[in-house]
């Protein structure tokens, strides 16, 4: 389940439908075949359990997930940098945000012990993990090296 040289399976952020997108079209603002919404918004998507499962389990793009909480100062400080990283990394990497207070199942499943923690998933499996707030360029470099 990786991006092939000819196409990628991209999950729609609005309706959750899988969309096969030819690789040359990934950077051309593709839209969902079902609901016509843009497949990439240039910003991280807030994920609940179901949308996390769809993007990580069904899509073929690497998925970078920021596990955070509203009460966490470093998490809030890193939020603008993570949003800027989405503008740089999409459409090669999908970026999600998981609030560990609202979706504690995922924090438990992935044994999140400190926040912010970022995990890069490839093919539905954890490929890399890092903890601590980072500036935009460090997020981009780390994600590209892990993807």
Explain the meaning of each model-derived region.
Residues 21-30:
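Short linker/helix segments within small regulatory modules
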Residues 12-15, 32-35:
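Short cysteine-rich clusters marking metal-coordination/redox-active sites
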Residues 36-44:
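Short Cys/His-rich micro-motifs in 6-15 aa windows
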Residues 44-63:
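A short beta-strand-turn-helix
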Residues 46-47, 67, 78, 82-86, ...:
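Thiol-based oxidoreductase modules, predominantly thioredoxin-like and allied folds used
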Residues 114, 119-147:
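Non-catalytic, surface beta->alpha helical segment in thiol-disulfide oxidoreductase systems
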Residues 60, 67-71, 114:
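Short pre-active-site segment immediately N-terminal to redox-active cysteine/selenocysteine motifs
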Residues 19, 39, 79:
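Cys/His-rich microdomains that often coordinate metals
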């Amino acid at each position: 389940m990786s991006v092939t040289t000819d196409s990628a399976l991209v999950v729609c952020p609005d309706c959750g439908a899988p969309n096969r997108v030819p690789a040359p079209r990934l950077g051309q603002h593709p839209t969902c075949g079902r609901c016509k919404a843009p497949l990439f918004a240039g910003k991280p998507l807030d994920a609940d359990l179901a949308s996390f499962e769809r993007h990580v389990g069904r899509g073929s793009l690497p998925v970078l997930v920021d596990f955070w909480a509203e009460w966490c100062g470093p998490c809030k400080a890193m939020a603008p940098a993570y949003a800027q990283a989405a503008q740089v990394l999409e459409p090669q990497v999908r970026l999600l945000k998981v609030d560990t207070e609202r979706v504690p199942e995922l924090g438990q499943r992935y044994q999140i012990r400190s926040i912010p923690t970022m995990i890069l998933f490839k093919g539905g499996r954890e490929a890399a993990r890092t903890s601590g707030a980072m500036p935009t360029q460090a997020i981009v470099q780390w994600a590209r090296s892990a993807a």
